[in-house]
Amino acid sequence: MPVFAVLSAIVFWMWVRARRAERPLKTRPRPHAEGERRILVIANETVGGRTLREMIRERSEGVRAEILVVTPALNSPLRHWASDEDDARAAAQDRLDASLARLASVGLRARGEVGDGDPLQAMEDALRTFGADEIILSTHPEGRSHWLERGVVAKARERFAVPITHVVVDLEAEQEEVRG
């Protein structure tokens, strides 16, 4: 009997969480002056890609942009359940620091944070405090992107009431261009 009660509670909790995730998150951007834009960037391994930097620069041209870069701390399911997220958070922080330095080198001021391992939850957490005007969501190309396989871009567009620009960053092609 106790096993049934525990399993029932877990199923109910998962159902409630799934229902909550289905509703679009209404964000309240902070009022800002004409010519200002708040850009939320969500990227993991692609956070340092040239294509993403170019998109951020393009979206912030001609305006005073406030940019928040969030790098989800992706972890293996086993490490997640064992509450062992230190390595994942440290790796995400390293990628984030390198990306912020690259953005600064091309004249873009941004701040960053390591987010939840679930990119949708990382977006929601950031939107609750940042109030973005738009989201730039960066992934690997199709066939190499776990986020595309899981439908993260489509789910984000359904879930959040903020315009989303999807940027595909092919890090291998960018490295070949540098070597070539």
Locate predicted features.
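Structural beta-alpha unit
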Residues: 106-134
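A short acidic, amphipathic alpha-helical/loop segment
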Residues: 52-55, 122-126, 152
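Glycine-rich, Arg-bearing micro-motifs that act as flexible, cationic patches
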Residues: 139-155
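Intrinsically disordered or low-complexity boundary/linker segments at protein termini
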Residues: 2-51, 161-180
